[in-house]
Amino acid sequence: MLTKRLLTIYIMLLGLIAWFPGAAQAEEKQPAVPAVFLMKTIEGEDISIPNKGQKTILHFWTSWCPPCKKELPQFQSFYDAHPSDSVKLVTVNLVNSEQNQQVVEDFIKANKLTFPIVLDSKGELMKEYHIITIPTSFLLNEKGEIEKTKIGPMTAEQLKEWTEE
């Protein structure tokens, strides 16, 4: 008798979840078009994030993150193979999560990273894009809207897929 009652309650709960599909989603919604930030790359170049008018891969990372360290050479290869006029690659180091900026600069030099790197020293981009896990990547369309989100490391194949769509 108790088993039938529990089964009935369970089926009713599943029905409610199916009826209200949004209630079962725990992931946080991203803003359709994030606010525009004018930032400087580590090389001193002015950059607008999002970069409206051009597809952009926006990637958040730190130098102490093992998956980030593993995937950054793939981002470098991607950057070398894709001229900036097709898809813009912008990476964001969460420098407020690092020991200090010098550690980041040393890491960049040691790994020969030449793609655009923005230092998010105040955590503004981290807050705007709701970064809670690194690495995290976004594909932004020409309007600056978030088309895709990848939490975790990106593979060369995923980078290629994102640029061919």
From Swiss-Prot:
It is found in: Spore outer membrane. SUPFAM superfamilies: Thioredoxin-like (SSF52833). Residues 27-165 form the Thioredoxin domain. InterPro entries: AhpC/TSA, Thioredoxin-like_sf, Thioredoxin_CS, Thioredoxin_domain, Thioredoxin_ResA/DsbE_sf. GO terms for biological process: sporulation resulting in formation of a cellular spore. Keywords: Disulfide bond, Membrane, Oxidoreductase, Redox-active center, Signal, Sporulation. GO terms for cellular component: outer endospore membrane. Belongs to the thioredoxin family. Thiol-disulfide oxidoreductase with a reductive function, involved in spore cortex synthesis. It could be involved either in breaking disulfide bonds in cortex components or in proteins that are important for cortex synthesis, or in thiol/disulfide bond interchange. This is Sporulation thiol-disulfide oxidoreductase A. It comes from Bacillus subtilis (strain 168). The gene is stoA.
